[in-house]
C-alpha cells in the first residue's frame, strides 16, 4: 500500500494565537485557510520547509480535551496524545521552543529506543509535542 502521512490535525481554542505561535516557533508558512459557515469550523494548514504539515482547527463552543502535563500522564487516556518531529539538534530546538513560549514537559534525555534522544514540550494551549533526535550518542 503506497501511503504517506499528509498532516496532523490539532483542535485549538484560539486559532489566531495558535497560528501565530506555530508559525513563529517552527518556521511554518500558511498553505491555505478555510471557514465552513454551517458548523462554524475554521482552519489553517501550515507547512514546514522539510515537508511536514499541521492543520489547526477551531470551532466556537469547543471544550478542552486531553491536557496532560507529560507523555506518561497522556498515556492514561486512549486516543490521540501527541505529534512528534525529528531534529538533528535536540537541545537547541528544545530551548528555542521554550524561548517561544512552549511549556517544558520532559527535558532532553535518552529515549527508550536505543540511540535516540527525546524531549517533550507543550504548545500554549497544552498540546504535547515530542522532539526526537535520531542516532544520538
Regions found by a protein language model. Name each.
Residues 8, 83:
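Hydrophobic adenine-recognition pocket in adenosine-nucleotide-binding enzymes
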Residues 32, 68-74:
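Short, P/G- and charge-enriched loop/turn segments at secondary-structure junctions
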Residues 52, 60-63, 137:
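Active-site/binding-pocket entry motifs
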Residues 14-15, 88-90:
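Helix N-cap motif at beta-to-alpha junctions
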Residues 56, 73-76:
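Helix-adjacent hinge/juxtasegments
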Residues 2, 10-54:
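Core segments of cupin and vicinal oxygen chelate
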Residues 1, 42-47, 85, 94-137:
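Vicinal oxygen chelate
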